[in-house]
Amino acid sequence: MKIKTRFAPSPTGYLHVGGARTALYSWLFARNHGGEFVLRIEDTDLERSTPEAIEAIMDGMNWLSLEWDEGPYYQTKRFDRYNAVIDQMLEEGTAYKCYCSKERLEALREEQMAKGEKPRYDGRCRHSHEHHADDEPCVVRFANPQEGSVVFDDQIRGPIEFSNQELDDLIIRRTDGSPTYNFCVVVDDWDMEITHVIRGEDHINNTPRQINILKALKAPVPVYAHVSMINGDDGKKLSKRHGAVSVMQYRDDGYLPEALLNYLVRLGWSHGDQEIFTREEMIKYFTLNAVSKSASAFNTDKLLWLNHHYINALPPEYVATHLQWHIEQENIDTRNGPQLADLVKLLGERCKTLKEMAQSCRYFYEDFAEFDADARKKHLRPVARQPLEVVRDKLAAITDWPAENVHHAIQATADELEVGMGKVGMPLRVAVTGAGQSPALDVTVHAIGRTRSIERINKALAFIAERENQQ
């Protein structure tokens, strides 16, 4: 049997982390078994579904490289198929037309609730033989079995059973002729030959209804697995107040897709005590029986730690391709300065996100208007004039410009003046970067370049001279 899974989001918003994890688990299960992964857009909610949301879902899937083998299929383009199946069910007697008014159904609901009963349709039209005009408004309901129970072996939670007496005669076609969500899902899974349905636990109550419809259609019933929800680190359901919840927001905030995927796969699944997984390892090791039944807590600090790991572990050239987008957001012209791959090597240890890296690198490419106020007050004082003049001259004398020679020039200045490296290094750092913090000074000066470094040292000396004149 060929394994076939699907990810079926509703395009009413962005791709959130819960949906992304579900997509990842479905994708991994298919890849682990050499199967196929289908993308289906469940856009039957015409009022809330938007083209922008569809694009956002696609963007998120593509950014995470969760490529699909079939699709995307759109439910709104399959209405003829759904209605043909409903008409067939009406002929076979597994569905019936219901003419009950909204007022009657509301009164029935209130009566049942007053008695402490679970609100459900009473089956009046199921057993009615009244004649109705062809154009009289009606819905179509599924004739759910009235006896027995539905049992399915959830691959994460174990056997789950529902009594058919608890289940309603589900509406499968509305008065406007449009099919309903639960019915469309069933026909899609049948037509697309889905073997395994991996989805959120909020769909557990839909499962017995869908199984009964599949059986009425004499269609194969897929295997089901329901993934637990994701909570914030405070134990409450994940929401915007816990931080970013959109996949593309994490891209915007400077996370690598590898970091988010690694974090999401471990958010409810484990393989021993291993924390870091390549995509190939995820595919190799992923099984549904290793997915936890318990809710997972989203920990942004852990994600940040993983992101920092991947910034330094992945090839700098690859990280640079993702950094480029953030550089563009900051409007930094990188034509005159180090290659982005070299920048990744320079700033990787200091920066935990690519956004932070982009915001920290401007001085490598563009001159700054002024020195940081605290840094200049502390380090660009008259006592720094001589160290800056000496180190400037030594840097200017270097014929070959590797970082090692820059280091020798700084060390030689400290030795000549008989001062500690900090007495030379800190004024030099502020002079060439405009700030009090940077990567190692020798590689920083090397990356900025000889000409630009000397120009900035002269600018710092002019600032010190002006400061002396004001005293």
From Swiss-Prot:
Domain of life: Bacteria
Motif ('HIGH' region): 9-19
Chief location bin: cytoplasm
Catalysed reactions listed for this entry: tRNA(Glu) + L-glutamate + ATP = L-glutamyl-tRNA(Glu) + AMP + diphosphate
Enzyme class, spelled out: ligase
Intracellular or extracellular location(s): Cytoplasm
Chain sites annotated for binding Zn(2+): 98, 100, 125, 127
Function description: Catalyzes the attachment of glutamate to tRNA(Glu) in a two-step reaction: glutamate is first activated by ATP to form Glu-AMP and then transferred to the acceptor end of tRNA(Glu).
Subunit architecture: Monomer.
Protein name, as recorded: Glutamate--tRNA ligase
Organism in which the protein naturally occurs: Shigella boydii serotype 4 (strain Sb227)
Lineage: Bacteria, Pseudomonadati, Pseudomonadota, Gammaproteobacteria, Enterobacterales
Gene expressing this chain: gltX
